Regions:
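Catalytic cores of secreted or luminal carbohydrate-active enzymes
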Residues: 1-71
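Proteolytic processing hotspots in large secreted/extracellular or virion-associated proteins
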Residues: 64-114, 120
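Solvent-exposed serine/threonine-rich low-complexity stretches and specific carbohydrate-binding patches
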Residues: 127-138
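Short, solvent-exposed loop/edge segments of extracellular or virion-exposed proteins
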Residues: 165-170
Length: 170
């Protein structure tokens, strides 16, 4: 941008690299990221609460919208991140976390999955979304478009089954 801050991807570094966020993609380094900001002075700022990455022994219950009555339970760490989008819409970002950073959580079984949980509040009770992570090398990755102020964390979503009723017309 015109301020000379053209940081298209960044990671935290203490005590070890944890979350890496890139504009559109994650490249070998900032200069190699081919994406550009649509508007000058657009940026994301994020930080974490320095919480532990081990399982909290508390579970986050997520209700799915649409009146299905379905829920899932997610084991989460105490570490959460706050991210602020400033200056307008940044667009889609790619988020990566080393799989080894999730080792304090329960190991996913064949029906479980690593997820990123996003919400409007630090208690993860308002406008809660989950995004499934996929494995890419030594990382778990997801694409997400952060808008405004959001909180996010990572976890292991447990398979939850239930019956659904379908009414066919005709």
């Amino acid at each position: 941008d015109n301020a000379g801050l053209n940081k298209k991807q960044n990671t935290d570094i203490a005590p070890q690299p944890m979350v890496l966020i890139g504009l559109g993609t994650i490249a070998a380094n900032n200069a190699a990221n081919p994406n550009t900001f649509a508007t000058d002075l657009n940026f994301l700022v994020w930080g974490d609460n320095n919480g532990d990455m081990s399982d909290t022994d508390g579970e986050l219950t997520i209700n799915f919208n649409g009146g299905s009555g379905m829920t899932t339970v997610v084991d989460t760490p105490t570490r959460t991140w706050k991210i602020i989008e400033n200056g307008g819409d940044i667009g889609s970002t790619r988020i990566a976390i080393p799989t080894s950073s999730l080792s304090g959580l329960p190991t996913p079984t064949s029906n479980d999955a690593y997820v990123m949980v996003i919400a409007d509040d630090e208690g993860f009770s308002t406008n809660v979304e989950t995004v499934f992570l996929t494995t890419s090398g030594a990382n778990q990755i997801a694409d997400y478009d952060f808008d405004g102020v959001k909180f996010f964390t990572f976890g292991v979503a447990k398979l939850n089954t239930g019956s659904l009723q379908i009414t066919l017309d005709g």
